[in-house]
Design a protein with these regions (language model features):
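Extracellular glycoside hydrolase catalytic/binding regions
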Residues: 39, 67-79, 154-175, 179-357
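Bacterial N-terminal signal peptides
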Residues: 15-28
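Short amphipathic alpha-helices and their capping/turn segments at secondary-structure boundaries
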Residues: 42-48, 84-91, 124-126, 164-166, ...
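Aromatic-lined substrate-binding rim segments of carbohydrate-active enzymes
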Residues: 81-142, 154, 209-212, 293-304
Length: 358
């Protein structure tokens, strides 16, 4: 037997350590982009030291490792990502890109973990930063991530962030969204879907991110698929660079301004909040008041100075009918059902491109 042989578990640990070190080297091989650094002060976001309202889009083309990417829309998104798409995002008027990243693909104990996937995520984020965008990296546990681990944040998300946080710790132009849409249902749902359970899951992730040396702004999604924020507890952050994320999707109890005030709006008056995901899906929800809801929500977010990240730039029939080379979805002559091309693409593009808007 080779005198330098190591037990299998030790060899595995050494390989993971070298893989992580290699990824960090790739990130630091060139200076981090100086522009687009994000911080929080009071209840507002700052970009390069100036008050900022995010205007962003989601990218889902790196939501799962390649071999675990399923579904026509996600496969299309994966294949079309590149410099041409990023230039289209710029022309759309966005200044921030949100990447959904697989929890399982980033968790060394997961069956779908892949060091190559982490390199791919890092390369995509670097490309966006080099193009001048601020970035959000969001850990996703839902089915499109390659495994269905929907529910509340737990040790899986913490392990994923111990892999991810060191990769982005040197660039404050990258915000870290800890866990996409804590949910009351799913394989990893908790017995109690409440704020104490939420805090018990989120705080260890905050600690892991800061222990990795990351000084980035941290974003924490609220309860009920990230729709609820009012009464959210504070999380302990030694850097006080912590903010909240809301996903204000249409629901029966979430249709008018009074609902929005009660569920997240009043909270946003005293806490930094960003809407990191939003859209209207006329293939699933087509009540007569949905177009009014969509227009009203955009105006509401603007009035509250809450940034908006539209989902998703690379997924068909959301912002664009097919892809970024073709027409935007529209609220004119709304159609319902699986073949609907209706949506808020034109609405959001108009907001993002209007220089008179904040």
């Amino acid at each position: 037997m080779d005198g330098f042989a190591q037990p299998a578990a030790t060899r595995s640990g050494i390989c993971l350590a070298f893989a992580a070190a290699g990824l960090i080297f790739l990130l630091n091989a060139s200076p981090a982009a100086a522009a687009g650094e994000v911080s929080v002060r009071g209840n507002e976001f700052l970009r390069d030291g100036k008050p900022w309202i995010a205007k962003g889009v989601g990218i889902v083309g790196r939501t799962a490792p390649a071999e675990f990417t399923k579904g026509k829309g996600y496969l299309q998104a994966r294949n079309q990502f590149g410099a041409e798409e990023l230039e289209s995002v710029r022309q759309f008027g966005a200044n921030v890109i949100r990447f959904q990243v697989s929890q399982g693909g980033s968790d060394p104990q997961s069956s779908i973990y892949s060091a190559d996937y982490l390199k791919e995520v890092l390369a995509a984020v670097k490309m966006a930063r080099d193009a001048g965008f601020s970035v959000i990296v969001c850990v996703d546990s839902q089915r499109p991530s390659g495994l269905d681990e929907t529910g509340m944040p737990n040790a899986k998300a913490e392990r994923a962030w111990r892999s991810l946080a060191p990769l982005f710790a040197k660039d404050r132009g990258i915000m870290l969204e800890l866990f996409n849409e804590p949910a009351p249902k799913g394989p990893d749902a908790a017995p109690q879907n409440d704020w104490p359970t939420w805090r018990a899951g989120m705080q260890p992730i905050v600690d892991a991110v800061r222990q990795a040396g990351a000084r980035n702004v941290i974003l924490a999604d609220g309860l009920d698929w990230a729709r609820m924020l009012n009464d959210a507890p504070a999380l302990s952050d030694p850097l006080s660079q912590f903010a909240y994320a809301v996903h204000p999707y249409y629901a029966s109890n979430f249709r008018v301004e009074a609902d929005w005030d009660n569920i997240f709006g009043r909270f946003a008056a005293t806490h930094p909040v960003m809407a990191t995901e939003w859209n209207v899906n006329f293939r699933k929800v087509c009540n007569p008041d949905v177009p009014q809801f969509a227009r009203g929500m955009v105006e509401y977010l603007k009035s509250k100075r809450i940034g908006l990240v539209e989902w998703a730039y690379d997924f068909p029939r959301t912002i664009f009918v097919a892809d970024y080379r073709g027409p935007l979805t529209t609220l004119q002559d709304v159609q319902c059902g699986n073949d609907s091309n209706s949506g808020v693409g034109e609405l959001v593009a108009g907001y993002f491109k209007d220089a008179s808007r904040p």
